[in-house]
Amino acid sequence: MWKRWRIRILLFLAVLGPGFITANVDNDSGGILTYSQAGAQYGYTLLWTMIPITIALIVVQEMCARMGVVTGKGLSDLIREEFGLRLTFVLMVLLVVVNYTNVVTEFIGIAGSLHLFHVTKFISVPFCAALVWFMVVRGNYKSTEKIFLVASVVYIAYIFAGVLSQPSWHDALLATVKLPQGSVWRDKMYMYTAIGVVGTTIAPWMQFYLQSSIVEKGIRVKDYGASRLDVIVGSFFTDVVAWFIVVACAATLFVHGMGAIQFASDAAEAMRPLAGDYAFILFAFGLFNASLFAASILPLSTAYTVCEGMGFESGVDKNFKEAPFFYWLYTLLIVGGAATVLALPDSQLINFAILSQVLNGVLLPVVIILMLLLINRKDLMGKHKNSPLWNVIAWGTSLIVIGMTMVMLWGMMPGH
C-alpha cells in the first residue's frame, strides 16, 4: 500500500509545476490590488465570488492542461491550425495589448512594495527588470521552474496577514456562502470590481501559458492524473490566498472607513497602524514577491503565445539564435513595462492597474469559447474531449462574464 502511494506522490512531484505556478502567478500585483480594493471598499460582500470562481478556474485550467497533454501543442498553435492565421493574428494583437498593461501593473507593484521600505522606483524597477530578464534568458526550464515554485509558496504570507488582521471569521465565512443583499447590486463600481475579480482570477494569458508549459515539460497522457492534481491544488491554493487578501483588507481598511485605495501598497501602509508591523511586512513582502514573480511570467507567457500562434521558435531551453523573436518580444515587454512606470507619474499608473484586470475579464470569454470549440472536437481529443458537466461550467462562466460586462458597459453609458 505504502509503495503504491509513494509512487503516486513521486509522480505528482515530478509533474508539479505548470498548474501550480500558473494558478499562483494569477495573484499578481493587479490581482492583489483588485482583491484589496474589493475588501477595502465592499468589506466581505464580494467573498461569495470565490467559490464559483475556484470551480470555474479548475475547469478552465484543467481543459488547457488536458489539451496540452493529448495534442502536444500549445493553445495558440491549435487556434492557428483550426481557425486560421487571420483570427490568430487578431487574437495575438489583443493579447499583447492586454498583457502589456498587465506587465506595467507588475512593475507598479514592484515600485510600490519597495517604496514602503524607502527604495525609489528609479532603483527598484530597473534592477528588478534586469533580474527577471537574466533569470529567464540565462537559465533553463528546470532551474526557472524551481525558482517559480519557491515564489509560489511565498504567497502563504497573505494567509498570515489575513489572520493577523483579526477579522470576524463568522461574517467572512457567511459572506463566502451567501449572496449579499441590498444596494450593492445597484452600485456600478461593485459590478466593475466583480468583473475585475473574475478577470484577475481567470486571466486569458494563464490558459496559453499553462498549455505551453505542459507541452514543454513533455507530460504524457498516462501521467495526466498527477498533472490534473497539480492544476486542482494550484487553483485551490491561489483562491485561498485571494480570500485572505480580501478578508485582511475588509477587517482593517473597510471596518475603519478608509474605503477605496489607489495602489496595493496603500493597503499594506494603511494596515500597519491597524494590524501591526508584522501584518504590514507580510503584506508588503507578499506584494513584492507576487509582482516580481508575475513580471517574469507574464512577458514569458506572451512570448510563448505569440511565437506559437505565428509559427516562430520558442522556449527557454533554446538560445537567442535559435529563438530570436521569442527573446526579443520577452525583452521588449520587460523594457516597455519598466520604462512606462519610470516615465509616467504615479497618479496616472493606477489606470493601467485597474484597466488591465477589466480587459482580462472582457477578453476571457473569447478565449474560453475558442477552447471549448477545440476541446469538444473528437478528431482532435478522441476519448479525452469534454464531459457534459465540464461544458456546462465552462459555457456558464463565459455567459456570466459576458453578461456582467454588458451590464457594466450599459451602466457606464450617459444617463444610466
Model-derived features: positions:
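Extracellular loop-to-transmembrane helix junctions
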Residues: I7-L10, Q37-E62, S76, R80, ...
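Juxtamembrane transmembrane-helix boundary signature
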Residues: T22, T49-F83, L91-T101
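Hydrophobic, small-residue-rich membrane helices and short re-entrant helix-turn-helix hairpins
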Residues: S29, L33-Q37, S143-E145, W205-F237, ...
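Flexible loop linkers connecting adjacent transmembrane helices
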Residues: T34-G39, E62-L87, K142, H256-R272, ...
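Extracellular/periplasmic helix-exit of transmembrane alpha-helices
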Residues: I58-V70, V215, F236-D266
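Loop-to-transmembrane helix boundary motifs in multi-pass membrane proteins
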Residues: L85-R86, F122-V125, V233, F237, ...
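Transmembrane alpha-helical segments of multi-pass small-molecule transport proteins
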Residues: M92-V93, L116-V137, Y158, F325-A339, ...
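Hydrophobic alpha-helical segments and their helix-loop junctions in multi-pass secondary transporters
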Residues: V153-Q181, M191-S212, L370-D379, M404-H416
